[in-house]
Amino acid sequence: MKPTIVCFSHLRWNFTFQRPNHLMSHFARERRVFYIEEPILGASTSTIEVEVIGDGLTVCTPHLIDDSRWRAESEQARLIRAFLLEQGVENPLLWFYTPMALPLAEGIRSSAVVYDCMDELSMFLGAPPELMAREQELMTRA
């Protein structure tokens, strides 16, 4: 059986049909795919909204109470690990579209890591200062 893919993306699934949508939809024909979106902050409780897009493809949107980046990353990582455990996911292939999601995968034992760098995110207006360091770390792991 092919490993489950856990995809971390900076793009909302329903924003516009782009490379992540195309590839993850294709992969979902043969394996489970969990597409993890960036969180929505300011929720009354921390949770993961789950939307089944089709056979094998599930979009997960974390909703977080706290708006502190560090606490938000920590809480999001906890929610993702708990969700994957509930789903029986073991040794997934971790697929990243943004290096900023790297801390979210802490504690997840993976079969492989893919960094699909489709944009020069460091050139975007408002790019976080730690983006380049995380990208270098992700390149080392992939």
Kindly give the residue locations of the regions a language model identified.
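N-terminal subdomain of nucleotide-sugar transferases
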Residues: 1-44
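Short, well-ordered alpha-helix to beta-strand connector turns
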Residues: 2, 30-31, 91, 110-111, ...
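A short, histidine- and acid-enriched strand-loop-helix "catalytic/donor-clamping" loop
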Residues: 13, 102-103, 117-129
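Membrane-proximal helix-turn-helix segments that form the acceptor-binding/catalytic region
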Residues: 23, 128-142
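Active-site proximal beta-strand in glycosyltransferases
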Residues: 32, 95, 107-122
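A conserved catalytic-core segment of Leloir-type glycosyltransferases
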Residues: 41-91
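Short loop/helix-cap segments at secondary-structure boundaries that form the rim of catalytic
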Residues: 52-53, 102-109
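Short His-centered aromatic/hydrophobic patch
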Residues: 96-100
